[in-house]
């Protein structure tokens, strides 16, 4: 109240000092602060910045793969020895770097993540019952964090409807004998405009450990390229946010409109002592080679699928491509066609792999591969990325599958008790009815087991979400009510051949044609 009175009196003084023409006299005084004191506290020792994190704390840890991870702060936690942590992070780095170091030292009790990925120790601890893992769709994870920072306690999303995320029962912790000790709980379901949505609760942390590029001495922060990812929403969602940066600059060095995170969200700040900035998957192209090759010599089956998948692209479309065959299909996009490739880690306008001297640890795709961007590209955070995806702004999603059902159910993220990679962003990518979903895969699994079947036997990624299936044997269109229709058939095969290798019935288009291949 005293401050308001002071401001009020200052404004009255300013007003009374005006002459009849509205000009200010020299004696005018407006009591606005010009102090350089800021609430962000600066540290030189990362251990000092995190030493009060208690056992059992919930930590939000930024990064995507190894891109944009707070290396120095993670190293400091190894030194403090804090334990029984709940770590909220898209994934857990690799076995010997990033959060993988805290897993190895058994300091983490529970991970809330979207992707286990290639971290063998992460998967081993989970399947052996040593670690609790709450697997959450990547876009839902980003939005839960964003909501937590915005004071929104919960929200509805179509992502995960009809899957274990909605139904409950997904393993969070295993017993030593492989049985489920803790399972996820069902989500509340509501219907809006004829579509089903599930209720997801916001996530907040006791502390957030964030990696940024630069900060000014006021505590304002900017990120670099695709290293923004989960770092940005996590800044806003913790009781105490600790940010490590590569450089600290003077106040005024940033134009106000260029600041990514205002100082109000930054409580502690430290300049990292050193950075390894390890690259998880160094992918390069050679000089004069504009595009990567489509596959290894002799991979005729994959080549066939890739060259058919490339025909799904249309000029001007926005597309998100999964790793493997979908991404390789982009190598065959015509130079006369523009397709804007979106990557869920926060890039729009992906280009080819870099030359050796262009590789940048801060610029990767969703497969953690080094990439470049094309003119007109943009970078953004993970929550922004999935707003594009969930909102139906991406025209095409192309991804692989373990199983697809007759009516378009998709399974591609888990084999219970055996393989847990996590759903990553796949559940979000297939959640919008405005986005065409194309599955590319080999027609049969090992031992000629069916992959196209009456009903999926593996946990679903999405329910009735697939629009088209492309295999080396043919192309199916999928109708949510009427099922499959064979529209293209590989030369030399018969419809009976397809029936024998397909685990459900299907219709045959009256306009059945030979399987198309893009010309090269």
UniProtKB/Swiss-Prot annotation:
A single Gene Ontology MF term assigned here is: identical protein binding
In the UniProt record, the transit peptide is located at 1-39
Its primary localisation, in coarse terms, equals mitochondrion
Give the EC class as a word. transferase
Q: Which GO terms describe its biological process?
A: adipose tissue development; heart development; ketone body catabolic process; ketone body metabolic process; ketone catabolic process; positive regulation of insulin secretion involved in cellular response to glucose stimulus; response to activity; response to ethanol
Keyword match rRNA-binding: no
Disulfide feature? none
Active site residues per record: 344 (5-glutamyl coenzyme a thioester intermediate)
Localization, per the record, is: Mitochondrion
Instruction: Give residue numbers for the modification (Phosphoserine).
Output: 170
Q: Which UniProt keywords apply?
A: Lipid metabolism, Mitochondrion, Phosphoprotein, Transferase, Transit peptide
Which EC numbers does the record give? 2.8.3.5
Which domain of life does this protein belong to?
Eukaryota
Instruction: Give the record's GO CC terms.
Output: mitochondrion
Keyword S-adenosyl-L-methionine belongs to the record: no
Q: What does this protein do?
A: Key enzyme for ketone body catabolism. Catalyzes the first, rate-limiting step of ketone body utilization in extrahepatic tissues, by transferring coenzyme A (CoA) from a donor thiolester species (succinyl-CoA) to an acceptor carboxylate (acetoacetate), and produces acetoacetyl-CoA. Acetoacetyl-CoA is further metabolized by acetoacetyl-CoA thiolase into two acetyl-CoA molecules which enter the citric acid cycle for energy production.
Family to which this protein belongs: Belongs to the 3-oxoacid CoA-transferase family.
Protein name, please?
Succinyl-CoA:3-ketoacid coenzyme A transferase 1, mitochondrial
């Amino acid at each position: 109240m005293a401050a308001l009175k002071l401001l009020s009196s200052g404004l009255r003084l300013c007003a009374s000092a005006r002459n009849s023409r509205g000009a200010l006299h020299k004696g005018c005084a407006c009591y606005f602060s010009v102090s350089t004191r800021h609430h962000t506290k600066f540290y030189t020792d990362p251990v000092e910045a995190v030493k009060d994190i208690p056992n059992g704390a919930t930590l939000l840890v930024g990064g995507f793969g190894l891109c944009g991870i707070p290396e120095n702060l993670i190293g400091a936690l190894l030194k403090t020895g804090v334990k029984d942590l709940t770590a909220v992070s898209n994934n857990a780095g690799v076995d010997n770097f990033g959060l993988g170091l805290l897993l190895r030292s058994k300091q983490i009790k529970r991970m809330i993540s979207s992707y286990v990925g290639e971290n063998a120790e992460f998967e081993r601890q989970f399947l052996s019952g040593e670690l609790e893992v709450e697997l959450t769709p990547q876009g839902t994870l980003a939005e839960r964090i964003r909501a937590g920072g915005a004071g929104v306690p919960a929200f509805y999303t179509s992502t995960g409807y009809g899957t274990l995320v909605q139904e409950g029962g997904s393993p969070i912790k295993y017993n030593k004998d492989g049985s489920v000790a803790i399972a996820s709980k069902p989500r509340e379901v509501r219907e809006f405009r004829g579509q089903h949505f599930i209720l997801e609760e916001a996530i907040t942390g006791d502390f957030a450990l964030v990696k940024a590029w630069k900060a000014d001495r006021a505590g304002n922060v900017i990120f670099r390229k695709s290293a923004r990812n989960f770092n940005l929403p996590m800044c806003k969602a913790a009781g105490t946010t600790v940010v490590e940066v590569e450089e600290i600059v003077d106040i005024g060095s940033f134009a106000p409109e260029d600041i990514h995170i205002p100082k109000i969200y930054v409580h502690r700040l430290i300049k990292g002592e050193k950075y390894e900035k390890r690259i998880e998957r160094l992918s390069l192209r050679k000089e004069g080679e504009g595009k990567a090759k489509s596959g290894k010599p002799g991979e005729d089956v994959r080549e066939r699928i890739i060259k058919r998948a490339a025909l799904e692209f249309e000029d001007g479309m926005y597309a998100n491509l999964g790793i493997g065959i979908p991404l390789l299909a982009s190598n065959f996009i015509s130079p006369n066609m523009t397709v804007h490739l979106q990557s869920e880690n926060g890039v729009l306008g992906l280009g080819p792999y870099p030359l050796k001297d262009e590789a940048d640890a801060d610029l990767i795709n969703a497969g953690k591969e080094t990439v470049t961007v094309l003119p007109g590209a943009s970078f953004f955070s993970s929550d922004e990325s999935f707003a594009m995806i969930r909102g139906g702004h991406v025209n095409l999603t192309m991804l692989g599958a373990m199983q697809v059902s007759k009516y378009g159910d998709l399974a591609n993220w888990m084999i219970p008790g055996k393989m847990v990679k996590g759903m990553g962003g796949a559940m979000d990518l297939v959640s919008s009815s405005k986005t065409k979903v194309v599955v590319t895969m080999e027609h049969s699994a090992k031992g000629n087991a069916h992959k196209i079947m009456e009903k999926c036997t593996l946990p679903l990624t999405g329910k009735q979400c697939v629009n088209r299936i492309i295999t080396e044997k043919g192309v199916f269109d999928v109708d949510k009510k009427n099922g499959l229709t064979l529209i293209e058939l590989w030369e030399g095969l018969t419809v009976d051949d397809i029936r024998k290798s397909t685990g459900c019935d299907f219709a045959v288009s009256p306009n059945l044609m030979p399987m198309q291949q893009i010309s090269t």
